A protein has these predicted regions:
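Blade-level signature of beta-propeller repeat domains, shared across WD40, Kelch, NHL, RCC1
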Residues: 342, 346-351, 355-357, 361-385
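Bacterial Sec-dependent N-terminal signal peptides
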Residues: 2, 17-49
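Repeated scaffold domains used in trafficking and secretory/extracellular systems
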Residues: 84-89, 127-133, 179-186, 227-233, ...
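Residue-level detector of Asp-centered blade-edge/turn motifs that repeat once per structural unit
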Residues: 40-42, 90-94, 134-137, 187-190, ...
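A short beta-strand motif characteristic of beta-propeller blades
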Residues: 72-80, 117-124, 167-176, 216-223, ...
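Short loop/turn segments immediately following the C-termini of beta-strands
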Residues: 51, 102, 145-148, 158, ...
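Short loop/turn segments immediately following beta-strands, especially the blade-tip
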Residues: 58-69, 107-115, 155-164, 205-214, ...
């Protein structure tokens, strides 16, 4: 695997980062915690990117008893776009929503009632962005994009007042004898590691300096040409990485995270998900994991055991919308949200059974005026925990 980095990065900077990385990592699976920034905007809002109607829909989540809740459209929803949304991320302050297209990242301010307002002059040009994430300290937005031969991660510094983005660093990597299909990027809760799923190109791990925004490529996981790594989740302790994989050897694969981001697959991995896992998410406690299977429109649920191993939950898999594509947890930790590109419904919300812990119970759903709306992504506000 060859590595090409943005011009202007000096050798001395790399040496300094290597020393810093050694200080940040200790024994296997241990990382110095990165203190998350507390949210400024309160409220429990979720946003859905619709690729057929070229819009973003916002909903307020109202808590009810187990199995009951409401999703109410926020004022001005849906917001019509002049482009097709490709990915979304919310700032750690919950003040800004970032929405990418094939050529740019656009910034919207989030009102106290969840409404969205475009912010003039704060967007940036960015090519083929497929996934974004914001660092736990709230300083950085990272985007994943690229081509079939080159994956690229851009690092942007976030202006806390305006949400404006300033490009500070770029990391590029190619994978020998593989076709890269950039899928998902996730920053670890520790803030020091960045993971990127590259479809049939496997996965790549970067060390990340949260002071300077510098990336340093550390490891690549190769897969066969008939395998695609699509989604990622990292547990709260930055101890285990969960990969949603489809094709040959499909399922949820679990890797122990070691020193410097080194990965080693745990025993019994992969864990069954119907062979076509597209995305994966952990609940707020880290005790349960959920994987979306686009092929059969279901969500597989698991209890997370010691060492990160998974055991199927009672009633799993659970029915969802057609071609369920994206999962997230609301900022209270009480609900799982699922967006389905095939609709029927476009957005589903589940509560967690108290009698059978972890089991999903349908709580609310939304079928939009145009169904399917192509609801590919759902993002929820941060809890600040």
């Amino acid at each position: 695997m060859s590595k090409r980095w943005a011009a202007g990065v000096q050798q001395l900077a790399w040496m300094a980062f290597a020393v810093a990385a050694m200080a940040l990592t200790g024994c296997d699976g241990f990382f110095v915690p990165n203190v998350p920034v507390p949210p400024v905007t309160t409220g429990n809002y979720v946003y859905v990117a619709n690729t057929v109607t070229n819009s973003v829909s916002g909903y307020a989540v109202a808590t009810g008893t187990t199995g009951t809740a409401t999703l109410t459209a926020v004022p001005g929803s849906p917001v019509s776009l002049q482009y097709t949304p490709v990915a979304m991320a919310i700032s750690r302050s919950n003040k800004f929503l970032y929405v990418s297209s094939v050529g740019s990242i656009n910034v919207y301010s989030i009102g106290s009632n969840g409404s969205l307002t475009a912010t003039n002059g704060t967007g940036v040009t960015a090519i083929n962005v497929t996934s974004m994430d914001v660092s736990p300290d709230g300083q950085w937005l990272l985007s994943l994009g690229g081509t079939s031969v080159l994956a690229q991660i851009n690092v942007y510094q976030i202006n806390a007042s305006t949400g404006a983005l300033t490009l500070t660093n770029t990391g590029q990597t190619s994978v020998a004898n593989a076709v890269i299909v950039p899928r998902m990027l996730r920053i670890s809760p520790s803030g020091t590691l960045v993971f990127a799923a590259l479809g049939t190109g496997g996965d790549v791990v970067f060390n990340f300096d949260t002071t300077t925004g510098t990336l340093f490529n550390s490891q690549n996981l190769a897969v066969s040409a008939t395998t695609s790594d699509n989604g990622l989740a990292v547990d709260n302790a930055t101890a285990n990485l969960y990969i949603a994989r489809s094709g040959t050897g499909g399922g949820v694969r679990v890797f122990r995270i070691g020193t410097g981001g080194s990965l080693s697959e745990i025993a019994r991995s992969p864990f069954a998900s119907g062979g076509q896992a597209y995305t994966v998410v952990l609940d707020s406690t880290g005790k349960y994991a959920y994987a979306a299977n686009r092929a059969n429109s279901t969500i597989y649920g698991y209890a997370v055991g010691t060492g990160g191993g998974l055991t199927a939950l009672d009633g799993s898999p659970y029915g969802s919308g057609l071609q369920v594509s994206s999962l997230d947890i609301d900022n209270t930790g009480a609900y799982l949200l699922a967006a389905a590109s095939g609709g029927k419904p476009d957005l589903s919300m589940y509560s967690f059974d108290t009698t059978t812990p972890g089991m999903l119970i349908p709580a609310a759903s939304v079928t939009m005026g145009t169904d399917p709306a192509g609801s590919m992504f759902v993002v929820a506000m941060h809890s600040g925990q």
